[in-house]
A protein has these predicted regions:
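Alpha-helical interface subdomain recognition
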Residues: 2-147
Length: 147
């Protein structure tokens, strides 16, 4: 279930990235597209990088699960990271949209609400951190498996 929740978070992140990129490409301010402003393109760059990292970790956790391997550590990591990335991406997307994105009927606003609840589903971020810490500190994990 944590892998599935991580996947949902990735979907939110992808949507947030797509909305933000489209809007930044379409919106003009001070005679140029806002995607040309460093604060906007830096936000977009980090959104895409974080999306890729969380997606790859989730794929890895799913692969472990598909191969009937223990994956509670990887699933917890994927859920924790993907949820945080979804929240950050949704927040950045709303920021790029400005007050327009804050309107309740706007998709950017909806994504922020969806990203918030993803942080709670299948265990809060604090619970995920506990799961990860317990596995890392347990005798069943050695240094070789973590790196």
């Amino acid at each position: 279930a944590r892998i599935q929740t991580a996947s949902r978070a990735i979907g939110i992140t992808q949507s947030a990235c797509g909305l933000a990129i489209k809007y930044a490409n379409d919106r003009h301010q001070f005679g140029k597209k806002i995607i040309k402003f460093p604060r906007v393109y830096n936000k977009l760059a980090m959104m895409v990088v974080e999306l890729m990292v969380s997606r790859q970790l989730t794929y890895y956790a799913a692969e472990q699960k598909d191969n009937n391997k223990r994956c509670d550590l990887e699933a917890g990591m994927a859920k924790l990271l993907s949820s945080r990335v979804a929240w950050s991406a949704a927040d950045n997307s709303l920021q790029i949209h400005g007050s327009y994105g804050y309107a309740l009927e706007h998709p950017a606003s909806r994504l922020l609400c969806d990203a918030r609840i993803i942080n709670i589903f299948e265990g809060t971020a604090e619970i995920q951190a506990n799961v990860i810490s317990r596995r890392i500190l347990s005798n069943s994990i050695n240094e070789k498996n973590i790196s």
